[in-house]
């Protein structure tokens, strides 16, 4: 279960999973397990954020990018 997922709109959920899939495809095999989303929220700028199993968190943008 992903903490905070219920607070996202359907559009935000689609963005979350789409960008995470792209993000996961870009990392090496050793890192793929840590790319699982464990928590999500929307920040004050209305940007979807995701905390991953590896402890890192990212902003996921409408342009299908992350930072």
Language-model regions, residue ranges each:
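N-terminal non-globular leader segments, chiefly Sec-dependent signal peptides
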Residues: 1-47
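Short linear proline/tyrosine/threonine-rich motifs used for host-factor recruitment
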Residues: 50-52
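A short, surface-exposed beta-strand/turn
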Residues: 56-67
């Amino acid at each position: 279960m992903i903490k905070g997922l219920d607070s996202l709109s359907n559009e935000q959920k689609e963005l979350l999973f789409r960008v995470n899939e792209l993000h996961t495809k870009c990392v090496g095999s050793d890192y793929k397990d840590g790319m699982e989303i464990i928590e999500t929220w929307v920040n004050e700028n209305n940007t979807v954020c995701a905390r991953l199993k590896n402890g890192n968190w990212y902003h996921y943008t409408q342009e299908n990018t992350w930072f």
